[in-house]
């Protein structure tokens, strides 16, 4: 697994062996950032001013990709200690710890906001229905700026229902995954 673009392009990321995570595939991340960079639907670009949330962070690949491409700050949230250690290791390897906050928390109970995000990545376990719960919790606890964009990765045939205060901007198939783009209003 590697960073696809930006400052740390081609740098490898640690993925723990045997750990129960499903990192977003390189090809899917490449497609995701291409969509974000080349579509007029996304007011969070350029990334230079963006505060990014990487929810269900796993290895931290989505937030790290955003930092590599110029995001101001990234907050990584996961409820698994091994995932948190992996994110911290990857941040240290890339010398990016000063631009990140890493929190061992349940995404459906994130606690009070420590940053107000303009871009949110959610890559929950497939078929878990956790994305909707996490988005609702992020709204209730003040984590999202009005107009924030949330990208949810699901299995190709999985459906999500945008929570109240979110509207579906678009959805795209990427191999066995589906990317859902939701706007918070």
Language-model features: where?
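Class I S-adenosyl-L-methionine-dependent methyltransferase catalytic core
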Residues: 1-185
